[in-house]
């Protein structure tokens, strides 16, 4: 039996990955992390989507310690989300160590349930500049987990080389475009669906959706070519 664990936030990217995983694996578990993020609604959204899609199990883990250590606009209500980069070249929404912790815990969970695949929706094409969304980081984490647990494990990143328009096309491939558009929470200001339309996350999401809806055939063709050439 093929089992997978999906790192699941209830946002556009992880929901698209979850929809795909449910088609490709016999048993799918979702894992969501409560790290004291700005909007607790994220967790409620993730729980509802996971239930509606019928995952085998949905685990919500309390990792509040991350909030104490990582100062970010996503972990502090008094820090407004900014479109400007900080002096270190990163947006102030970057939560240092977040994906290191998430992938480690997802790997441990996969070990316990006998799953050999962890799926995450990180992306290096259209992304916010987070270093822990890059392909070389994920590969390094994969190596560390395999060596540290002495067990075969693959971290799968279906969106790594897709732009946002192609990510929308992927959701549409699985007849889930409206599900993703209407029910996910990607907005940094905590508005479900199309969001506030003003934060960096909403800007990226809307630009990708507009590009896909205005050029469906071309974007879908590009997606299929990447799937065939890169095994996405």
UniProtKB/Swiss-Prot annotation:
<dbReference type="GO" id="GO:0008616">
    <property type="term" value="P:queuosine biosynthetic process"/>
</dbReference>
<dbReference type="GO" id="GO:0016879">
    <property type="term" value="F:ligase activity, forming carbon-nitrogen bonds"/>
</dbReference>
<dbReference type="InterPro" id="IPR018317">
    <property type="entry name" value="QueC"/>
</dbReference>
<keyword id="KW-0671">Queuosine biosynthesis</keyword>
<keyword id="KW-0862">Zinc</keyword>
<keyword id="KW-0547">Nucleotide-binding</keyword>
<dbReference type="InterPro" id="IPR014729">
    <property type="entry name" value="Rossmann-like_a/b/a_fold"/>
</dbReference>
<keyword id="KW-0067">ATP-binding</keyword>
<feature type="binding site">
    <location>
        <position position="202"/>
    </location>
    <ligand>
        <name>Zn(2+)</name>
    </ligand>
</feature>
<protein>
    <recommendedName>
        <fullName>7-cyano-7-deazaguanine synthase</fullName>
        <ecNumber>6.3.4.20</ecNumber>
    </recommendedName>
</protein>
<comment type="function">
    <text>Catalyzes the ATP-dependent conversion of 7-carboxy-7-deazaguanine (CDG) to 7-cyano-7-deazaguanine (preQ(0)).</text>
</comment>
<feature type="binding site">
    <location>
        <position position="199"/>
    </location>
    <ligand>
        <name>Zn(2+)</name>
    </ligand>
</feature>
<feature type="binding site">
    <location>
        <position position="196"/>
    </location>
    <ligand>
        <name>Zn(2+)</name>
    </ligand>
</feature>
<dbReference type="GO" id="GO:0008270">
    <property type="term" value="F:zinc ion binding"/>
</dbReference>
<dbReference type="GO" id="GO:0005524">
    <property type="term" value="F:ATP binding"/>
</dbReference>
<keyword id="KW-0479">Metal-binding</keyword>
<keyword id="KW-0436">Ligase</keyword>
<feature type="binding site">
    <location>
        <position position="187"/>
    </location>
    <ligand>
        <name>Zn(2+)</name>
    </ligand>
</feature>
<comment type="pathway">
    <text>Purine metabolism; 7-cyano-7-deazaguanine biosynthesis.</text>
</comment>
<feature type="binding site">
    <location>
        <begin position="8"/>
        <end position="18"/>
    </location>
    <ligand>
        <name>ATP</name>
    </ligand>
</feature>
<comment type="similarity">
    <text>Belongs to the QueC family.</text>
</comment>
<dbReference type="Pfam" id="PF06508">
    <property type="entry name" value="QueC"/>
</dbReference>
